[in-house]
Amino acid sequence: MKSERKAEIIAVGSELLLGQITNTNAQFISKQLAEIGVNVYYHTAVGDNPERLKRAIQVAQERSNFIIFSGGLGPTKDDLTKETIASTLGKELVLNEEAFESIQEYFRKTGRDMSPNNRKQALVLEGSDVLVNRFGMAPGMFIQENDTFYMLLPGPPSELHPMFENEAKPLISEKLGLKEKIVSVVLRFFGIGESQLETDLEDLIDAQTNPTIAPLASDGEVTLRLTAKHEDEKETERLLKETEAKILARVGEYFYGYGETSLVREASKALRDHGKTVAAAESLTGGMFSEWLTDLEGASSILSGSIVCYTNQVKQQVLGCREETLSSHGAVSKECALELAEGVRKLTGSDIGISFTGVAGPDTHEGQPVGKVFIGLSTKDHTDVFEWMFTGSRSGIRKRAVKYGLHHLLNLLKES
């Protein structure tokens, strides 16, 4: 066995090449493999064509020694992944009785007749380790031929994700003889750019060995993935905590959460933890702030209400923004944002009022440039207004405004 696994992911399905779906499976698998120290060098997508798939396999065999396939394990004629791999490797397909019984049981429970082609899903490569599919019909497979690993996974993410985490990942670790415990933690930051964060942590990043530090910028946020390995799991955790403490000592003011969380999820949690409610006056954002909150469970306990106050008439008549403020300073102003935040808080009886006013484009407004944004945040004791200048598309500016509003709301709750 070679000391290093060079992995390649081959996604099978013409729908990928037609742009009908996005290949999120490759992203997920790459991330999961990185957590156990397996490097992915290539992503390949190929349509439902046996000749082209066979050629893709041959190319992968020349440059990779761990080839993972996703898709093409279904019952229809265009599902040809395992047949093509069997032909390429000179293997037979054999019926897996356990998988076949599971398929039959599914049809019995649903009261449907099983068509003959469903039996095809229970066929596996002879000599392979079978990966149980608890959320679908087609089992996965793992087989080693000479020094190369081959893994076959179903295409639907709802089946692939649990199969990989519960079946494939432990099996890969076993096959690779991994003794070290590899643990990762993701730190999430907002309000600081990737370049500034890397500058502030330059010496830590330059000296990284164990744990490794991997920055990633995405949609106005920055994440740091810390990955440590050691045979003693407690030592792995200690290494991570030690490095995390050094990082947060420098840029902790921008840190908001771990793992796959988000600003809206953390802000919602903070509102619940503090027993507070928020109400929104949304001019620029047009209801986006409240939409993001209500996408999460339990929003009724934290969101009192939201007013989409796009016109000056609604700003005045519903939220009490003074005519003098609008005529002297305009709707896109610090003064207007302040009165809107206070107005919606008082109108709804909420603990916190938040307001959004600005210019999303494409044209300037009342002398204010595209991207100028004011966010008001009001409590019974104090009202603050934050001024920002964003760039990007109309929708991008609105999304950025909501994120910064959540950022300011979260900071307010942390300080209280």
Curated annotation (Swiss-Prot):
Record-linked PANTHER family: NICOTINAMIDE-NUCLEOTIDE AMIDOHYDROLASE PNCC (PTHR13939), NMN AMIDOHYDROLASE-LIKE PROTEIN YFAY (PTHR13939:SF0)
Similarity annotation: Belongs to the CinA family.
Designated name of the protein: Putative competence-damage inducible protein
InterPro entries cross-referenced by the UniProt entry: CinA, CinA-like_C, CinA_C, CinA_KH, Competence-induced_CinA, MoaB/Mog-like_dom_sf, MoaB/Mog_dom
One Pfam family linked to the record: MoCF_biosynth
Signal sequence bounds: none
Entries under HAMAP family matching the protein: CinA_B (MF_00226_B)
Organism: Bacillus pumilus (strain SAFR-032)
Taxonomic lineage: Bacteria, Bacillati, Bacillota, Bacilli, Bacillales
